[in-house]
Swiss-Prot record:
Biased composition (Basic and acidic residues): 218-239, 247-263
PANTHER family: C3ORF6 PROTEIN-RELATED, COILED-COIL DOMAIN-CONTAINING PROTEIN 50
Keyword Membrane (UniProt): no
Cysteines joined through disulfide linkages: none
Modified residues (Phosphoserine): S5
Gene Ontology terms describing biological process: sensory perception of sound
Annotated InterPro entries: CCDC50 (IPR039303), CCDC50_N (IPR029311)
Modified how: Phosphorylated on tyrosine residues.
Sites of N-acetylalanine modification: A2
Name this protein carries in UniProt: Coiled-coil domain-containing protein 50
GO MF annotation: an example: ubiquitin protein ligase binding
Length: 305
């Protein structure tokens, strides 16, 4: 095999070749680090966007739950108001019926009193009519008494029995009036007791409903607060985990870059151009990395100039 002749005057120096190799290696490492940084930035942006979307969904869900709770409260308020209106209307109807019944009873009592008064006037007129007859009869009765030896006359008996009958009728009417008034007072007291009990029951129902609504509202607020705290805690944990992961990833990448980076060969001792072995230089150059021979020669020639 014929020996290949190499023009030693066009070959670059060893230091220049090592420097060019180091520059190329630095460029490669910088490009790799830049790509890793871009990938990390894109990954962090994707994670941040996902977290924002999750937070928006949670906030929307909480808002919907709050709106539902408010709608339920308004519905309960309306139902309670309607119930109160129905109770008030029922009480008003009862009061109206009671007032009408009382008015009718008063009218009946007035009619009865008027009739009794008319009867009393008629009885009074009858008594006035019987009074002269009683006077005339007393004289004849006296004569009859003295003649018959102590027998009572018929006029005296009628005069004594007529006031007794009138007095007995007045007593019955007075007793009936007292009984009616007592019955009215008893009915009124019973109605007042029923109304007071109904009002107390309505107040108790309203108080219980208000307490239940306050409890439900407080429970909804506590649930919303706990959800917000949990979301904030999850966000902090994710942020801490993300920062720790990024730091560990950067440390691993830096360590890997340091491990993967080959050590630079020590600069060779200065030799005379005539002592340079072309075969030794060719072997060393092929062991490190295969560069373009024409490019290296061109760079070395340019540096010499």
């Amino acid at each position: 095999m014929a020996d290949v002749s190499v023009d030693q005057s066009k070959l670059p120096g060893v230091k220049e070749v090592c420097r060019d190799f180091a520059v190329l290696e630095d460029h490669t490492l910088a490009h790799s680090l830049q790509e890793q940084e871009i990938e990390h930035h894109l990954a962090s942006n994707i994670q941040r966007n996902r977290l924002v979307q999750h937070d928006l969904q949670v906030a929307k869900q909480l808002q919907e739950e709050d709106l539902k709770a408010q709608a339920q409260l308004q519905k309960r308020y309306k139902a309670l108001e309607q119930h109160d209106c129905e109770i008030a209307q029922e009480i008003q109807e009862k009061l109206t019926i009671e007032a009408e019944r009382r008015r009718i009873q008063e009218k009946k009592d007035e009619d009865i009193a008027r009739l009794l008064q008319e009867k009393e006037l008629q009885e009074e007129k009858k008594r006035k009519k019987h009074t002269p007859e009683f006077s005339g009869g007393s004289a004849s009765g006296d004569n009859y008494y003295y003649e018959d030896g102590g027998m009572k006359s018929r006029g005296i008996n009628e005069a004594v029995s007529a006031p007794a009958r009138v007095s007995h009728r007045d007593q019955e009417w007075y007793d009936a009036e007292i009984a009616r008034k007592l019955q009215e007072e008893e009915l009124l007291a019973t109605h007042m007791d029923i109304r007071a009990a109904q009002v107390a029951q309505d107040e108790e129902i309203a108080r219980l409903l208000m307490a239940e609504e306050k409890k439900a509202y407080k429970k909804a607020k506590d649930r919303e607060k706990s959800s917000l705290d949990k979301r904030k805690h999850d966000y902090d944990c994710k942020s801490k985990a993300k920062s720790a992961h990024s730091k560990s990833k950067e440390g691993d990448e830096t360590q890997r870059a340091k491990i993967d980076r080959p050590s630079r060969p020590p600069p060779p001792a200065a030799m005379a151009p005539e002592d340079v072995d072309p075969t030794h230089f060719t072997n060393q150059h092929s062991n490190t990395r295969h560069f373009s021979k024409s490019e290296s020669s061109h760079k070395g020639f340019h540096n010499k100039q």
